[in-house]
Amino acid sequence: MIRASDISVRLAGRQVLHGISLDAAPGAMTAIVGPNGSGKTTTLKAISGELTPSAGKVTINGRDIASLKPWELALKRGVLPQSTVISFPFTVREIVRLGLMANGGEASAHGRIADQALEAVDLAGFSGRFYQELSGGEQQRVQLARVLCQISAPVAAGEPRYLLLDEPVSSLDIRHQLTIMRLARQFCADGGGVVAVMHDLNLTSMFADQIVMMKAGRIRARGAPKDVLTDETMEAVFGCRMRVSVAPAHDIPFVLPQSATM
């Protein structure tokens, strides 16, 4: 389990997270949602170890991440950032295989693992292409393939591993949004855990087990999608009155932007 205990973060002298506590269990997808500037990405960076909290602590499978060496942390969780700028002319294959540096293992298997990761994100046949030649959505999927190479097994040495994804479907068409979300769900079904920053509330409702809703650096609601996505919380957090509906056959809430009033 990833556990954040009362963490606060200060950036440039301003406190941006105020006492955040959350548990992200293996076998489950935790989605962090909220308006722009609410602290979602900062929370993900804090639980990944990229940012050091000014107060509180984060543990992964019971170990304080502050006590882990970078290579140890790299074996326990993989991180997909919001965007990645690469200035050098790397091929897709070279980018994806960077994820294998933490894994070790037989070098002879690296090509197969990279090809499997590219196939999983629907980029089979792209390995020889230059990264800069790809569309934004294709680049995003290349980076996810790299993360999958790093954390290729959801469970290793008897411990769950985690994918930390910052807006993993923001640049994708609907088909590939579903592909990536189903891939994340399968990672959970196989024993790993996923924490994802999300903006699409309908995709979040379809795939997440737990929603953590943030506003102004604080958690305003948490729980199952049907408990968090309510008319009241939507208005309180996003500042617009909106009707949350439920599909009768599946008991999954969905939000129609057409119903919003400002």
From Swiss-Prot:
Keywords: ATP-binding, Cell inner membrane, Cell membrane, Membrane, Nucleotide-binding, Translocase, Transport. One of its GO terms (molecular function) is ATP hydrolysis activity. Part of the ABC transporter complex HmuTUV involved in hemin import. Responsible for energy coupling to the transport system. The lineage of its organism: Bacteria, Pseudomonadati, Pseudomonadota, Alphaproteobacteria, Hyphomicrobiales. Its EC number is 7.6.2.-. The complex is composed of two ATP-binding proteins (HmuV), two transmembrane proteins (HmuU) and a solute-binding protein (HmuT). Belongs to the ABC transporter superfamily. Heme (hemin) importer (TC 3.A.1.14.5) family. It comes from the Bacteria. It is found in: Cell inner membrane. This is Hemin import ATP-binding protein HmuV. ATP binds at residues 34-41.
